[in-house]
Every structure is written in C-alpha cells, then in structure tokens.
C-alpha cells in the first residue's frame, strides 16, 4: 500500500540520507548537497556531478513489482564495477519515458525512445497511467506543438552517447512516437481519456480503475475538479481538443 504523503516523503528522505552516508564512507573528497525539501541530493566529486531526485507525486508501482536488474555489460566494462538496481515494471518505466518525451521533447528522452527494445503497445498501461498524473493537458501528448531542440541537442546531449543520433534522427523518432501513441489507443481508451478530462469517468467499469488511487492521479483529479468548479468552459475546451484529435464527435 502507498503511504500518505508526509510518511512517504519522510521515508524517501531517510533513504536519500542513507545513500549520502554510504557515499561519504566510500569517497572522502565527495561533496554532498542535500535538498530534502524537494527530495533531492547532489553529489560532486572531481568535476563530476550526480543528482538523485525522487518525484514526490508519482509514487507507487503499476503493472507489476519492481525487480532487480544488473548493469549492462558495456557499462560494467566502462566503469569497472557490477551494480544491481531495483527497477519498476517495463510498462511503468517506458510509459514514463514516453510521457516525458512527448511533453519535454528533449533529445535525451527521444534518444531513449529510439533505443527502446519493446513495442510501444506493450507499455500502453504505463503510458496512460503517466498521462493521467501529468501536469499537462492530455491532448498535448497526442498532438504536441513541435519544439525546435537544436540548441538542446548541441548543449545538453552531444557527447553523451557513442551511438549516433542526429537532429534528423531526433525529428524522425518524435514523429514516429506521436504516430505510434495515437495508433495504439483503442476506441475505449480514447473515450476513457476524454471522460477523464471532462471528469465524467465511470470508474466502476473502467479497466484503469485502480489508477485513481495513486497520488499523482488523485492530484490531477483534484485539479480538474477545481477547474470544473471555477471555469467549466475551459475544462470542456481542453476535452474538446482531445476529442478532435481522436476524431470523436
């Protein structure tokens, strides 16, 4: 079960402090900057910086338990060590990556999407979960305003990967992703997402009923309910844009 917000954040920060303490024991010259108000620590050593930040809202596991995965052979060879990490289910992991790629359109996210080794359709549940808890209107993910990311490509991605990824690759990957996420949605999925934006969902019949108990989705529902009360025309306008994209009359 997911703990309440205060208990969850307290336990997250306890875990971050344990990580910080282990790092100090291993590296005498490490500098650690805690920002527990936002569940974050920054570690700096010899010109390198690692940020560890936990999302305070998107808590909980969907589509299965977290499992231990071993660092890939290439990374083990590069860093000279073997590490295991507990990773969320593939639908939740890649669903979150796709949602981020559609929202931020950052080269790093689209590069990861290009390297995905599972079909988009197989992570649909995780994607829908992330869309329901997003701070952006759902229609923006299915018909995003395309952002010119040439500067980000040069300043925030170039040199991060040995695998070639040109700006043309970025644009092609983005176009293919938008096409794929639209194609994998069934008529029932589309009607559900529109009803969610309208706040008219019948949760008793929805295959995604369990999602409403998660903090991020509760938060989004709360905000949509506030909008429905204060500006119902705006709420319906956002839903109508999604209807138009989906071809729902």
Positions of predicted regions on the chain:
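Structured mid-to-C-terminal alpha-helical surface segments
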Residues: 2-249
């Amino acid at each position: 079960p997911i703990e309440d917000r205060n208990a969850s954040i307290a336990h997250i920060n306890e875990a971050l402090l344990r990580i910080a303490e282990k790092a100090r024991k291993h590296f005498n010259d490490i500098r650690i900057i805690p920002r527990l108000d936002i569940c974050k620590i920054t570690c700096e050593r010899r010109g390198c910086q690692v940020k560890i930040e936990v999302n305070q809202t998107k808590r909980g596991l969907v589509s299965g338990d977290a499992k231990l995965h071993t660092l890939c052979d290439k990374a083990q060879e590069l860093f000279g060590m073997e590490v295991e990490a507990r990773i969320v289910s593939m639908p939740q992991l890649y669903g979150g990556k796709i949602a981020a790629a559609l929202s931020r359109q950052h080269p790093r996210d689209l590069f990861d999407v290009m390297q995905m080794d599972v079909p988009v359709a197989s992570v649909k549940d995780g994607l829908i979960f992330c869309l329901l808890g997003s701070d952006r209107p759902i229609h923006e993910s299915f018909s995003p305003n395309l952002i010119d990311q040439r500067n980000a490509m040069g300043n925030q991605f170039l040199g991060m990967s040995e695998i070639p990824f040109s700006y043309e690759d970025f644009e092609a990957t983005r176009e293919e992703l938008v096409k794929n996420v639209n194609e994998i949605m069934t008529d029932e999925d589309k009607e559900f997402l529109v009803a969610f934006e309208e706040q008219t969902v019948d949760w008793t019949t929805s295959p995604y009923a369990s999602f409403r108990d998660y903090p991020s989705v509760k938060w989004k529902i709360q905000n949509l309910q506030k909008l429905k009360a204060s500006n119902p025309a705006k709420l319906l306008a956002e839903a109508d844009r999604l209807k138009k994209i989906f071809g729902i009359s």
